[in-house]
């Protein structure tokens, strides 16, 4: 495989020379109906990717296919899955796909022995998680006072919180409808003491199980919250070691610690933001909904992973989505992307994608540490529809910057409690707004009053399925993970480290240790941090 910068590719120069089509012409003109029918492809597990409202045409799609070939995007994806050392900065493999590979013999047989061993390790840990969850649900594991556990709290931050929390919220309604709710579930992430205090104030402390998630075992915020919770439990006359579970690595200070009821392990080959399908997400979600639900989620993710191996970009939704995103960011210069799920269940999904995308591809040097001159990962933001329509859509429609949009929608609601009101159901109203927004952003509107004129030409895509189920959620998560990795390959980035996270953390440690001077001291003095207690 060859690793080269994007601007060294012949297809890149070709894309720069092609004039982008007008959406008013290609989508809203006489060929629009046929375009809507054709510009769509499967993404796995019933999920579909629709790109008719993107500013691409046959010429651009051909050039994007050439770029995919020139940058060997699928070959690099296959190499990653086979255990190549893709994380160059930290000299590590990238193996989160193995956590949802299951026991597919044909898939495993082609993998190197070392990778098969890692798959066996991940599978063993997942089986331990399932056994532990069944023990809790069936009453085999109880509190120190003999009561069954009723609630579970995940304590973690970053990838140990954003992904698992987003997935839990996404499945909560589905689980209620299908009577799959096993335990009430909560999350603590911020080191802000009000976060933990507020969550704990609403809990039956005696019957709550706490999951501490830190791969390194040294995460400041997570360890601080653990001690906060332990303090509150002791004040209530409870013993913390009878109510804590750890999720960490086998080399962390938390490993094999008798102060935890159980410990479950991951490794350095699974990055935090890619860890939702590992034990990082499995423990809390299996306790919340049971092993079968999480198993269906994994199967949906595995199906999307297999779809991402397709060479033809028009049959590979993640690859096509990635290439169009590279075209919009680097060729057209669009700086942002809005993720707009028309499902309240996905309320926190944009926040997870924000970390997944911006921490992966928010880089200004290539995978060899050499500065690059072209634009890379966009700023990601989003909010569920129709809430966002009453918030920031004004800017999206009439602002001076074009923001590509990624809509997500489902034909049916999760709970099914949807009476006809004023001639239509709530779900019909929701979906009518999705359709209206796609066309409105593309077509715009002319008016004699400039203040009421909409320029249109605002590109969007649509990911949709019949319903948000565990399988479609797994495919949705894997689609974005694979999309972001493909983009990193195209830009020649290392999408699996996060050096930008470290600088501020290091300075904060100096401040708390009183090792400050100059402007750092001046800002610290605003909060009287020089006189903060140290123990």
Curated annotation (Swiss-Prot):
Example GO molecular function: glucose-6-phosphate isomerase activity
Pathway annotation from the record: Carbohydrate biosynthesis; gluconeogenesis; Carbohydrate degradation; glycolysis; D-glyceraldehyde 3-phosphate and glycerone phosphate from D-glucose: step 2/4
Organism: Treponema pallidum (strain Nichols)
Catalyzed reactions: alpha-D-glucose 6-phosphate = beta-D-fructose 6-phosphate
Taxonomic path: Bacteria, Pseudomonadati, Spirochaetota, Spirochaetia, Spirochaetales
HAMAP family linked: G6P_isomerase (MF_00473)
Keyword match Isomerase: yes
KW Cytoplasm (keyword) present: yes
Protein name in UniProt: Glucose-6-phosphate isomerase
Family from the record: Belongs to the GPI family.
Protein's gene: pgi
Cellular compartments per GO CC: cytosol
Enzyme Commission code: 5.3.1.9
Role this protein plays: Catalyzes the reversible isomerization of glucose-6-phosphate to fructose-6-phosphate.
One example of a Gene Ontology biological process annotation: gluconeogenesis
UniProt-listed PANTHER family: GLUCOSE-6-PHOSPHATE ISOMERASE
Pfam families: PGI
Keyword terms: Cytoplasm, Gluconeogenesis, Glycolysis, Isomerase
Predominant subcellular localization, coarse grouping: cytoplasm
The organism's place on the tree of life at top rank: Bacteria
UniProt xrefs under InterPro entries: G6P_Isomerase, G6P_Isomerase_C, Phosphoglucose_isomerase_CS, SIS_dom_sf, SIS_PGI_1, SIS_PGI_2
Compartments where found: Cytoplasm
Gene3D superfamilies the record matches: 1.10.1390.10, Glucose-6-phosphate isomerase like protein, domain 1
Record NCBIfam families: PRK14095.1 (NF010695)
Active-site annotation: 359, 390, 505
């Amino acid at each position: 495989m060859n690793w080269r910068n994007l601007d060294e590719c012949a297809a890149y120069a070709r894309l720069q020379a092609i004039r982008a089509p007008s959406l008013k012409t290609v989508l809203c003109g006489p060929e629009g109906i046929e375009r809507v029918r054709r510009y769509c492809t499967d993404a796995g597990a019933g999920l579909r990717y629709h790109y008719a409202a993107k500013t691409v045409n046959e010429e651009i799609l051909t050039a994007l296919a050439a770029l995919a070939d020139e940058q060997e995007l699928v070959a690099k994806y296959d190499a990653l899955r086979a255990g190549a050392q893709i994380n160059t900065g930290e000299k590590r493999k990238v193996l989160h796909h193995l956590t949802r590979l299951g026991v597919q013999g044909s898939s495993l047989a082609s993998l190197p022995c070392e990778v098969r061993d890692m798959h066996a390790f991940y599978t063993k840990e997942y089986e331990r998680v399932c056994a532990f969850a069944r023990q809790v649900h069936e009453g085999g594991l109880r509190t120190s006072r003999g009561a069954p556990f009723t609630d579970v709290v995940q304590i973690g931050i970053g990838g140990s919180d954003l992904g698992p929390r987003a997935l839990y919220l996404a499945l909560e309604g589905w689980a209620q409808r299908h009577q799959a709710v096993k335990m009430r579930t909560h999350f603590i992430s911020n080191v802000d003491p009000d976060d933990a205090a507020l969550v704990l104030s609403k809990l039956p402390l005696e019957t709550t199980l706490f999951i501490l998630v830190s791969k390194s075992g040294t995460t400041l915020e997570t360890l601080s919250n653990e001690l906060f919770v332990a303090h509150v439990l002791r004040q209530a006359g409870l013993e913390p070691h009878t109510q804590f579970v750890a999720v960490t690595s086998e080399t962390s200070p938390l490993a094999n610690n008798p102060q935890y009821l159980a410990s479950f392990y991951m490794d350095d080959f699974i990055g935090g933001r890619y860890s939702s399908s590992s034990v990082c997400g499995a423990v809390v979600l299996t306790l919340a909904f049971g092993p079968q639900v999480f198993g269906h989620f994994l199967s949906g993710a595995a199906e999307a992973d297999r779809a991402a191996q397709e060479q033809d970009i028009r049959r590979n939704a993640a690859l096509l989505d990635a290439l169009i995103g590279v075209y919009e960011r680097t060729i057209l210069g669009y700086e942002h992307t809005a993720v707009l799920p028309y499902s309240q269940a996905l309320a926190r999904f944009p926040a997870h994608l924000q970390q997944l995308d911006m921490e992966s591809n928010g880089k200004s040097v290539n995978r060899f540490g050499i500065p690059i001159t072209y634009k890379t990962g966009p700023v990601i933001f989003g909010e569920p529809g129709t809430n966002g329509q009453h918030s920031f859509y004004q800017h999206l429609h009439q602002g001076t910057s074009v923001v590509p949009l990624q809509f997500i929608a489902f034909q049916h609601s999760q709970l099914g409690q949807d009476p006809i009101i004023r001639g239509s159901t709530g779900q019909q109203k929701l979906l009518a707004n999705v359709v209206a927004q796609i066309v409105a952003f593309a077509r715009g509107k002319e008016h004699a009053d400039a203040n009421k004129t909409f320029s249109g030409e605002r590109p969007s895509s649509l990911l949709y399925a019949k319903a948000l189920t565990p399988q479609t959620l797994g495919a949705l998560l894997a689609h974005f993970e694979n999309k972001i990795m493909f983009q990193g390959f195209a830009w020649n980035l290392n999408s699996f480290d996060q050096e930008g996270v470290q600088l501020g953390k290091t300075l904060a440690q100096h401040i708390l240790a009183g090792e400050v001077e100059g402007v750092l001291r001046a800002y610290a003095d605003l909060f009287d941090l020089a006189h903060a207690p140290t123990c």
